[in-house]
Amino acid sequence: LNLALKALGYPEHSVDAIREMVGKGARELCLASLKGYFNGNVPEEAFEAVHRGFMREYPHTWQEGTVPYPGIREMLLSLAGEGHPLGVLSNKPHAVTVPLVRHILPEIPFREVMGFSERFPRKPEPDSLLSIVRSWGREPAQVCMVGDSAHDGNTAVNAGTRLILVGWGYSSRSALDA
């Protein structure tokens, strides 16, 4: 994001500021990154320029600093060892999500890794999660979605799955409590 902003002459955001903007997809991230510069009324041409820049850079830079949260690898291996099916559902583009997950968690036997594509609307719409649930031959109430954002929580509620929201991800505790 900062590469796209900097290339267009906008100030960069701190990692903490970006963390608060993440979770609703690239378009919303780019829009949120500009709102402070335009009193909330972001011109379409500014948004489109930043979004184009972000989409051009992200496939080449996602590896920088992308690591699993502490304890995640062990937790996932434990769940897989107990026979629980595991999947990943992200609003990141599918073409980035699959290599990202395979890069940072290569030893985890995910049954499904799904990023955003035109096939389904973005989270919090339930369609993509329900597709995963069906592919596992399960009913929504038999599946638990673990998420780190309000969007994840809303996706689980909309799909009728169980939910665990964790505080170690992108969203602050106060945002999750809301």
For each of these PLM feature ranges, what is it?
Residues 6-8, 12, 32-41, 65, ...:
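Substrate-recognition/cap helix-loop segment adjacent to the acidic, metal-dependent catalytic center
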Residues 20-60, 70, 78:
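A metal-dependent, Asp-based hydrolase signature
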Residues 68, 86-89, 145-146, 165:
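Conserved SAM-binding loop
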Residues 25-28, 74, 95-96, 150-151, ...:
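Short alpha-helical
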Residues 1-20:
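Active-site neighborhood of HAD-like aspartate-dependent phosphohydrolases
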Residues 133, 144-178:
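Acidic, Mg2+-coordinating phosphoryl-transfer loop and its flanking beta/alpha structural elements
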